[in-house]
A protein has these predicted regions:
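Conserved catalytic core of the tyrosine transesterase superfamily
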Residues: 1-294
Length: 294
């Protein structure tokens, strides 16, 4: 089954355009499922056996996972991964129907504009070298000032240089969108590029780790965690909270919901609305008029 899981991982990367984080989680789920079914059935797990898996088998697997302390949200993600894996092995639509746990959607808690800037400044001030300080500031300003996901910011390459008034961003499932760049955000990136000791070619990562490799999102998360403790901010003050704040502050200042969908790269803000195209000029006007740091 190891080869089957490897093939599924390649399928996720090539055909489903899943992020590295999602692929790791899904592959881990597949390994857990195979291990569980082997013990549950008392027999070696094969592709043919997986094709015959029952709803009762899946309920038993989820019950075991829930006994490990899995939340409803995590259990729902686990079930989604299981369905995807079984559909890959046995064919689309062959997985037994199983109702997932009800997930209560939490309300994002944004930080204030002043808190967002203070957070970025504190992270930058804690860096050991000026170019690392400039890097961390630029990354966090992309999250708050342009609404990028951390993975989108770290996925940027030298192809975005030289910077203009907008930025082309590749988001989830390889969807590309155009986001305006506030002067302050653009200046932050340019300051980092000028100080960065590593050459940034078109195909190279824009944001580098201390040794020149790709900057790890975990490093930014840890830096934010340390900064929020020093500043007395809540534990929900994360890199992603800056993106939530971007959206919340724009809406509070009258930004059009459909324009915001485009800026965030969401299929919908309510999980039911469709992804709406808005012309770039209108997006720029909405952005300049609504963003508190514009």
């Amino acid at each position: 089954m190891k080869q089957t899981i490897v093939a599924w991982e390649a399928h996720l990367a090539q055909n489903r355009r899943r992020s590295v984080h999602t692929m790791r989680a899904y592959v881990a789920t597949a390994h857990r499922l195979v291990e569980f079914l082997g013990a549950h059935w008392g027999a070696e797990v094969s592709s043919d056996r997986l094709a015959a898996v029952t709803a009762a088998d899946l309920r038993a697997f989820l019950a075991l996972r829930r006994s490990d302390g899995l939340s409803n949200a995590s259990a729902a993600r686990e079930l989604s991964a299981v369905r995807g894996f079984l559909d890959f092995v046995a064919g689309e639509g062959t997985t037994p129907r199983l109702k997932g746990p009800r997930v209560k959607r939490g309300v994002p808690r944004p930080v204030s504009p002043d808190e967002a800037v203070a957070l970025a400044e504190d992270v930058a001030d804690s860096a050991v070298e000026p170019w690392l300080a400039a890097r961390d500031w630029a990354v966090l300003m992309l999250l708050y000032g342009a609404g990028l996901r951390i993975g989108e910011a770290l996925g940027l390459t030298g192809a975005v240089l030289p910077l203009g008034a907008t930025l082309s961003v590749t988001g989830k499932r390889a969807k590309t969108r155009i986001v305006p760049l506030l002067p302050r955000v653009r200046e932050g990136i340019e300051a980092y590029v000028e100080l960065c000791p590593w050459p940034i070619a078109r195909g190279e990562p824009l944001f580098r780790g201390a040794k020149g490799g790709v900057l790890d999102a975990a490093l930014i998360r840890r830096a934010v965690q340390a900064a929020r403790t020093r500043l007395g901010l809540g534990d929900r003050t994360t890199p992603h909270a800056l993106r939530h704040s971007f959206a919340t502050h724009l809406l509070a200042r009258g930004a059009d919901l459909r324009a915001l969908q485009e800026l965030l790269g969401h299929a919908s803000l309510s999980s039911t609305q469709i992804y709406t195209a808005v012309d770039a000029a209108h997006l720029m006007d909405v952005y300049r008029n609504a963003h508190p740091r514009a």
